[in-house]
């Protein structure tokens, strides 16, 4: 067996795998008790699934806190892409779920803050979808927005999903640059009847602001 040849082959394989790994990390903030902006719940869930699939396909690594009504469909999208294409799921998705009990009597709010900080500091981009709970906007999403802005992430509120995402859009759009407004309009000024077109426009808008 030629050891030098094997080492060279292994190096090429490792280099190839390295080049295939995602180059951008995107934090997706979202939760949903209801799915505003879509004609039915199925389309909204398909939108989340397709968005995650296409982000992975375009070499983005998704970071998510597994918010209700959102996290499950992001997971399914990334998983489908990775298993179809023989990719490692861990290279394309990080799930950082929030603790749901206080059995140790730790300060649960403090743990939530630290969890949000750790998720956001890993990322270059923050996208915001839906954000509603019991007919009110999600305070957790607003906290994530402020953290992401503080840390200088590129912000993408998807306002047609309503809730906190719309609230964040209204805060960010009016006084922003023309290029940011162009990207926001590309994302949000479209019918939600065509899920694939929606996702295509979101990817184009992200690339527009990453130039």
Roles of regions detected by a PLM:
Residues 2-4, 8-21, 148:
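Short amphipathic alpha-helices and their capping/turn segments at secondary-structure boundaries
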Residues 25-26:
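Conserved hydrophobic helix-helix packing surfaces used for dimerization/oligomerization
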């Amino acid at each position: 067996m030629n050891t030098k040849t094997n080492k060279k082959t292994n190096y090429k394989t490792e280099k190839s795998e390295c080049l295939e790994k995602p180059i951008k990390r995107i934090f997706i903030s979202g939760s949903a008790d209801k799915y505003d902006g879509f004609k039915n719940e199925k389309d909204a869930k398909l939108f989340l699934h397709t968005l995650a699939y296409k982000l992975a396909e375009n070499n983005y690594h998704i970071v998510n806190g597994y918010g209700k009504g959102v996290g499950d469909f992001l997971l399914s999208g990334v998983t489908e892409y990775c298993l179809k294409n023989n990719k490692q799921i861990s290279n394309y998705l990080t799930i950082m779920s929030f603790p749901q009990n206080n059995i140790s009597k730790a300060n649960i709010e403090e743990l939530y803050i630290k969890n949000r900080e750790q998720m956001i500091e890993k990322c270059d981009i923050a996208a915001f979808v839906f954000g509603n709970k019991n007919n009110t906007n999600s305070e957790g999403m607003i906290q994530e927005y402020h953290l992401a802005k503080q840390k200088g992430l590129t912000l993408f509120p998807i306002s047609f999903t309503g809730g906190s995402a719309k609230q964040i859009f209204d805060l960010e759009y009016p006084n922003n640059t023309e290029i940011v407004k162009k990207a926001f309009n590309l994302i949000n000024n479209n019918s939600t009847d065509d899920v694939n077109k929606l996702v295509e426009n979101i990817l184009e808008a992200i690339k527009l602001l990453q130039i």
